[in-house]
């Protein structure tokens, strides 16, 4: 290794992170992938070792095999919760995907997902296509992704008023008092696959007394980061900051979007001006349940047995745990399930790329759900809903939180 190469390696922040792994194996106890496929490469320990071998030249060439290994991760963060060294494996995997993508190129699928969701035209076209397929009763065209309309009765509240269409920050306990001008951030998946749930979110926010605007926004950047398009994710972050800065608060009903928006300061840390703007914005980001709970919203009660699945980004990323449960306890006959925070196996496009593995992970989740006897399974993340929706039927509905707590 040349002196120049040695210096580059020694100054590599990612390598410094990888060097903290002592291969204790704590991650193997909580990794959803390892639980259904007991291979060391499935764990954080295995993937971090491969990444270190590549960066230090022990594994001189990566190529498609190494890319596949780095992509075989749900980015759920379960390993980081139990890691004695507090290694953020998800961050390491995202960094490696970007580096390998720059060197070896990205697959057509990953480029299509990243570029497509960043395109308003593509999202509009996709929304229209999905709506048409549903209207014509062609479920195969929508991939079985969208749960059936809820049978939960409405309580007679009027519909929404006309709407205008124009490293996570530590926020601590927050008050919703004084928040007037609220922006509802419509995530790509909510807009594409769950527009009725998105409308229910807005209706609920209005019932809680908020003035709600739906500004034109771009993708939050999570799909781009996950697929190695870091620079595109940075560009989207800047566009969204510019669009959302005027608002008192920004609320989203997608846990991944909320977590991504809060992480903009980290994403733009090397640009002082944008980092300052990102930090100011991050302090104004709320998840739907977080804001409604802080505002004291009282949902109508329905005689339904309901259980709740914690999305990884909302629970582990933002620490939102009690708010959705408090709302559901008021809105239903709530039942807590075992391992509610266990990843469902969806993780964006992971279930599409690894359907057999995702199916095994989902089966474990379904076992815990069915054990509660719940009629409705609730989540606050569209990616989770797309995965969990596959277990709907046999007396079980899968719904977004907003569809259960809306007026």
Predicted regions, residues:
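Non-heme iron-sulfur electron-transfer modules
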Residues: 1-7, 34-65, 86-114, 395-404
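Generic start-of-chain signal for non-secretory N-termini
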Residues: 1-19
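Cysteine-cluster motifs in flexible loop/terminal segments that predominantly coordinate metals
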Residues: 2, 24-28, 312, 347
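Iron-sulfur cluster-binding electron-transfer modules in prokaryotic oxidoreductases
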Residues: 10, 89-407
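N-terminal alpha-helical segment
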Residues: 13-14, 47, 66, 75, ...
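Cysteine-centered iron-sulfur cluster-binding motifs in ferredoxin-type domains/subunits
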Residues: 15-34, 67-87, 341
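N-terminal glycine-rich anion-binding loops that anchor highly charged ligand groups
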Residues: 26-29, 40-43, 211-214
